[in-house]
Amino acid sequence: MIDAGFWFEPVEFESRTLGGAITAEEIHTIAAVARSELTGAFTGLNIRFSNRRDLTYRVRVVQELRDMRVRWKTGVPAESRAVPGFGGQGSVSFSWLASAAVAYAPDGADRASIVDAIGRGIGRAAVHEFAHLLLPRANIDDASDINSYEYRSAARSEQYFGELRWGRVRPLLRERIPTCAE
């Protein structure tokens, strides 16, 4: 069994489209939707997610992430760093993904559906980052299947609305993480 940590740091978000700031109750909804997306993506594999911060594999949700590879101030949706044999850690940007969920929301989407979309976007970004952490030598990013967890960008409506599935990485995960039946 692999134990992995996933948790939210204190975050906030405000949008005119939403009619103001998200509430503490909505943050809890977002976290629950994100965790559901995360556990659902790894169903059948011997991996267990908790909010422990001291585990070998961990991804946290932070207010924002900056791309440290460039000198100008620019945000990124997520990042991770892994060392084969030692695990790794990643981060997911709440403000980047929440803003994108609002931007990709279909016309007429109500507040509750956008709040759920924020949770899905965050959970799906965490799924992608955990794939990088669990398979540090594998080429995870894919440009061919926009409906997969492996897709290289969170700048797409599918990240927040609709269903995602595993593509070519699922068999690699099965090799790395035994299934629950084994």
Can you annotate each of these PLM segments?
Residues 114-182:
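The catalytic-center signature of Zn2+-dependent metalloproteases
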Residues 2, 61, 149-152:
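Hydrophobic side chains in beta-strands
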